[in-house]
Amino acid sequence: MPIGKLRRSKAISFRGPASPSLKFKSFETLQGKPLGEMGQNGHKQEEDMAAQRPHFPAEAGAEQEMKCHVAETPAQNSQVPSTTMENGFYSFANISDNTTNKNTNRYSYLSDNTACQLLAPATGTDYYKSLTPTMKPITERQNHAGTTMSLDTIPTAENISFQITLPTVPPSVISSRSSLINRQRSLSMRYSSPSSMSSLGSTPTKLTTLKRSNAIRCKGGLLQFFSQYAVKTGKKLVKWKIALRKRLFKFQRRSTKNKKNSSPTTSHLKRVNGYVSNVRRSFSTQSRLALVPEIVRRTPSRRHLTANTGMKDATPASPSRTSIRRTPSSIKRAASTLSSNYVYRDGSDTSSQAPELKSTGSSLAPAPSQMVRSTALTSLNSIVRQPSIVVNNKVIPLSRFPGEKMQLPIREEDEEEEEPSTKTDDYVIDTSKRMSTIGEIQASRISSSSGSISSHSSSIQSSHFDDASNSCPLNDSIESDSDIECTRTAWNHFLRTVIAERIRMRLQLAKLQELALLKDDSLDILYAVLRKTLDEPADKSSSTYDPDIMPENNSETGLGNGFRSSDQLSRLKEGSRKRNTSSSTMLALPEALATVRRSITMPVGLNYI
């Protein structure tokens, strides 16, 4: 068995005693086991086999110079591994990774018997490559040092049966080699370009180098640093950009938040209703007065409205405004309302007249229609907003009454008198009878229920303004114009009398106050007048004209509403002395009048203290 080929058996386990084949021989393991003759003389057989190897004469000179030195004693053998490790030629096994460059790194002599590559570079001497490792046994024989190859053991420092060495280099050769390397390095640094100074192409300067991958020697540190720095800088720039954009937009929103939008906003309801709230109302003054009760609006000389006055009152609508709906039925209703006949019959005309053309002076006018129409308003939106009724899909507006005696009554027929053909009609317009106006109904109510001025004032209630169809029978007698005028005259006389009494009382108080400033004795007369005047409305006026208001003078002294204690009388005397004679008479009234509450019967237009 050749010495260079050392084998070891396959280890089943490396956990201690489980693998007895992989066990190193030592003094402890061999202490109690005596060696036989074959085991002690096993190295002799190895010497004989090594002597039979072929010996080349060309290597004789080099072999004498590069002779392996073997220690003679065990003490010297312990120093051999240290010297060989310093030279860098000791290698136990060929262990390397797949990235090791085989050209620049050496391998162990155990893997090859023919040649051994040294640490010197390719530029060194050539005779180093031809050297072959030699293994010479130790001549000294010891009982505990002999081993055999049959045991498949691996030699260690303690088990020194033979020494594994490599040819050593003399110090003279090493010094010459180092000087040669330094000379070449200086020349290359002087005459070479900077690109050739890369670490990848440089030769190793040390005798021993670690086995490492070529990727470790790559100059990638700075490249990785700058690439990471670029990525981080880009992220920071993006964050700064977003922050600046947010700040800018917040500033713009803050500046525009306080600004008011000058353009008017149109809501959905305004758009549907045809911009009603933005357009001037087309109701005229006459149409507003038509809703006022007849008792206040009526004048002695009344004239019937004509078509010309109605057209003047109406204001033309804007051409750009649209209607609410554009269905065929709404268009027909609007057309029938706008194109009605505005020439109405007088009160003396009867409904039995033939509907033919009649001569009115020198001009001919068509017979009036039996339908009641209001004065035409060109705005369809205004027509829809007016109070009206619908009969058989016909719109009858009720906002304006051109003539009092031209109103057609609307009555509901009894179920017994209805015909089968007219059962679908809710209302029937009777053209043979005239519908009384609101003014006539109010006047008749006032004249029939009141016998005096007080009864007239108490009879005006909200119940008298009900619908005419519910509160007025059809066969009710119609009052004449003279009765209405008489009622209005009596009401006006009552109001004038009350106002005149109040004014006269204040004038008398003012005159008495001026006299009281000159003489203190006249204050008694003033107090008597005040008691008399202040007690009268509480006893008469409030009970007669204001039944809902309770009297407020419940004082036990009997001095009226304003005088309830002697302190107030003393204050009144002192204040009357301090007042100036040039002051206004209305402002110079005593302070007691300020506490008197105004009665409802007193006119609203006067200013009270």
UniProtKB/Swiss-Prot annotation:
Residues 349-363, 552-569 have a biased composition (Polar residues). GO terms for cellular component: cellular bud neck. It comes from Eremothecium gossypii (strain ATCC 10895 / CBS 109.51 / FGSC 9923 / NRRL Y-1056) (Yeast). It is found in: Bud neck. Belongs to the AIM44 family. Residues 315-330 have a biased composition (Low complexity). Its main location: other. Residues 300-330, 342-370, 537-584 are annotated as: Disordered. This is Altered inheritance of mitochondria protein 44. It comes from the Eukaryota.
